[in-house]
Amino acid sequence: MNKKLNIAIIGQKFMGRAHSNGWKQAQNFFSLNAEPVLKVACGRNETELKKFADRWGWSEISSDWKSVIERDDIDIVDIATPTHLHHEMVIHAAKHGKHIFCEKPFALNLAEAESMLKAVNSSNTVNYLNHNYRRCPAIVLAKKMISEGKLGTIYHLRSTYQQDWLADPNAPMGWQ
């Protein structure tokens, strides 16, 4: 594997840690055509960011995500920030020709999602939205039943996903 892909991550809290671990472990699970390189970690608190970078193996840190996206040596921008920040970051990354790995939910509303999609489609880049529950057995079964027409025409869908960590009233509700 000779090709290397330089990654910049924006966000070093919970999802940033989860994504960093994923990038580090990917080669242990998949045959990759390129090696992910943990190049730059972006965040607001430089003291925390330095600890994060040291812990997960990021080469550099920055508190200026826009300038990092604009760098020529960055191939992929991993957006692991709260949802209300995704719109501006995705559009900026697409505008600068970066491939995008974005945490869910993608956008706050349909209008934001459509403008983000338009930016990605006009940029010759790939946007990957992290749908990590798509392999859950219940989701796979529901998709199969819909695809096979077993549920008829679907006009509306409302679902919930029961997380056991929500059963603990002392569990923190923030995901950052």
Language-model segments: residues:
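Hydrophobic residues in well-ordered beta-strands that form the structural core
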Residues: 102, 127-129
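N-terminal Rossmann-like dinucleotide-binding module
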Residues: 1-56
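Conserved G/P- and acidic residue-centered "switch" motifs that form tight phosphate/ATP-binding loops
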Residues: 11, 104, 149
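Core-facing hydrophobic residues within beta-strands of well-ordered domains
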Residues: 36-38, 74, 154
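Receiver (REC) domain switch-region micro-motif
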Residues: 41, 77, 157
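Alpha-helical structural signal in soluble globular domains
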Residues: 22-29, 52-55, 91-92, 96, ...
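Predominantly a Rossmann-like dinucleotide-binding segment in NAD(P)-dependent oxidoreductases
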Residues: 125, 133-176
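Beta-loop-alpha module in the N-terminal Rossmann-like domain of NAD(P)-dependent dehydrogenases
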Residues: 45-47, 55-119
